[in-house]
Amino acid sequence: MFLTNEKIRQLTVGAAAIYEEAEGLRFTKCTADQLAAWKEAAPWIYANAVGSTGVRLDFCTDSDFVTVKTAEYGKYEVKINGLLHAQYAFREADGNDRINSFTVHPGEGVNRITVSLPSHGPAGIISSVEVADGSFCERHRFDTKMLFLGDSITQGWNTKYDSMSYAYLVSEAFNADSIIQGIGGAIFAPSTVLPMDFAPDTVVVAYGTNDWGYYSDYTTYRNAVHDTLAKVNELYGSAKIYVISPIWRQDCGKTTKVGTFDDCCNTVRDMAALFGMTLIDGDTLVPPIMDYMADAVHPNDLGFAVYAANVIKAMK
C-alpha cells in the first residue's frame, strides 16, 4: 500500500517546510522567510540554503519491505534500526533519470527505518512510499529536540555519507528530533535568525570560519557575532544554547581583514560568555592533522566521527 502525503508528513523529521508539488513532497531545512533572509543577506549562499540537509523519514514498521520513489538527484541513505544499510546516489552525470526508486527489506518483526534525504544540492522530493498491505507505520519517538545553526561543516560538506555528519551523529546520540540548518558558506547573519514552528530544547550555533575571510574589518565581524547570538538568545532563551568556536583549518596561520584566526575564535568565545551560552571550544574537537580533513577546512568522515564524539562528551 502507498502512504498518503499526510502520512509521509507525519513520519518526517527535520523539515522546516514541506511543499506539495506535482512530483511529490519537497522538503526544505529552512522556512520561506529564512530563505528570503539568506537571499537578501548573502545571495551567493542561497543555493546552499534551499536544500534538505537533515531531513529524514524516521518510522517504525512491521512491513517486510519499504519502497521509496524520489524525484530529485542526490544521495538518499537508509538506516535500519540505527545502522547504515545503504546509500542510493542518483546523479545526472551518471545518466540517471530524476525519477528513481529504491527498496529495502528490513526483515521480520518491527524495525526502525530512517531514510535521509540529500544534504547537498536541490531539496529532496519524495514521490511515494510503499509498504506491505496491512502493515503499520509510526513515527519514531524522540526524547528531545535540537536545532543546529551553522555553515558547511554543520551541513556535512565532503562527507562520503551525509548521515555521518556531526549534526546527524549528535542528533542520534541524544535521540533528538532535530532540524539541521547547516548552510555552505554561511556566516553570522542576524537577519536570518527567524522564528519557526519548532521549539528546541537545545540549540547549537557554529559559524565563524567563513566570517574570518568575509567581513571587511574586525568591528563589523564582532557586531555580527554579537547581534546573531542576541537574536538566538531572544528566540531560544529557554533552551540550552551551545556555541561552537571554529575548528582548526590548514591556513589558520594567516591574517585577514578581521585579524588572526585566534582573533576570530576568541570573539566567538567572548560573545558566548556575554550571553551566558555554553561554549564548546573548536580546538578540542578535531585533531589538527590533515588525515582527519577532507580539505583545508572540512573534516572527512573520520574527522566528523571524532568531532561528534567530542561534542557529545561536552554536552553530557
Predicted stretch roles:
Residues 182, 245, 283:
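Residues at the C-termini of beta-strands that transition into short coil/loop
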Residues 147, 179, 242, 278-280:
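Hydrophobic/aromatic beta-strand patches that form the interior of the parallel beta-sheet core
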Residues 142-227, 250-254, 259-266, 294, ...:
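Conserved SGNH/GDSL esterase-like catalytic core that processes O-acyl groups on lipids
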Residues 1-146, 312, 316:
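N-terminal secretory targeting modules
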Residues 206, 244-245:
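Alpha/beta-hydrolase-fold catalytic nucleophile elbow
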Residues 236-240:
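A short helix->loop->beta-strand "cap" motif at the edges of active sites that frequently abuts
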Residues 249-316:
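Catalytic His-Asp segment of secreted/periplasmic serine-dependent ester chemistry enzymes
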